[in-house]
């Protein structure tokens, strides 16, 4: 009888641990691997879509975006998690902003994350549509960062199980 109680207790602990690991709707993403082919396309489309502003790709801003990518992935994961824990999300966003502030080293720049659901292919049209949809948020983000006349950008892209994240860093 004592062995049976111990076995039941061990099984119960195992079941509880398994339930905790699978409780959230979005599993933690794999390490943020860059999709360099899509990244090149997004950079080209961004230059084409921003030709009126003479946008150019800047390798230094792309490097900043790359260094911020892992924390940006964690922020999107926290936002998409179910049930959502606002403390985890706010901590992830704060960490993303801290890494960004450290990496930009005083440059005036804005971090602009854009994510697409996994069923949505990232194309020039979907990128333009996302910008049109998020235009007010993007403008507000740029202005808060002090970027009033964007001319340079960097971009990294990662495909996760639940989404594709396009992470822009925009500067004057």
Q: Where are the predicted features?
A:
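Bacterial N-terminal signal peptides that target proteins for export
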Residues: 1-11
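Sequence-pattern detector for short linear motifs
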Residues: 8-9, 37, 138
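Regulatory sensory/coupling modules that transmit signals to nucleotide-handling catalytic cores
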Residues: 14-17
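C-terminal motif of bacterial Sec signal peptides marking the signal peptidase cleavage site
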Residues: 19-23
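Short, well-ordered surface patches within globular domains
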Residues: 26-100
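A well-ordered secondary-structure block
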Residues: 91-172
């Amino acid at each position: 009888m004592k062995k049976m109680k111990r076995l039941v207790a061990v099984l119960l602990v195992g079941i509880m641990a398994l339930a905790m690991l699978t409780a959230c709707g979005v599993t933690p993403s794999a390490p943020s691997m860059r999709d360099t082919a899509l990244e090149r396309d997004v950079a080209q489309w961004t230059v084409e879509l921003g030709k009126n502003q003479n946008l150019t790709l800047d390798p230094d801003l792309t490097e900043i975006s790359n260094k911020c990518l892992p924390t940006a992935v964690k922020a999107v994961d926290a936002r998409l998690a179910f049930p959502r824990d606002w403390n985890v999300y706010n901590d992830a966003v704060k960490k993303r902003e801290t890494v960004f502030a450290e990496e930009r080293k005083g440059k005036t720049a804005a971090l602009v994350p854009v994510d697409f659901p996994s069923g949505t292919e990232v194309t020039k049209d979907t990128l333009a549509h996302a910008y049109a949809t998020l235009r007010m948020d993007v403008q507000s983000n740029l202005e808060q960062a002090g970027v009033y006349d964007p001319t340079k950008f960097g971009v990294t892209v990662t495909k996760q199980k639940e989404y594709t994240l396009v992470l822009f860093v925009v500067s004057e």
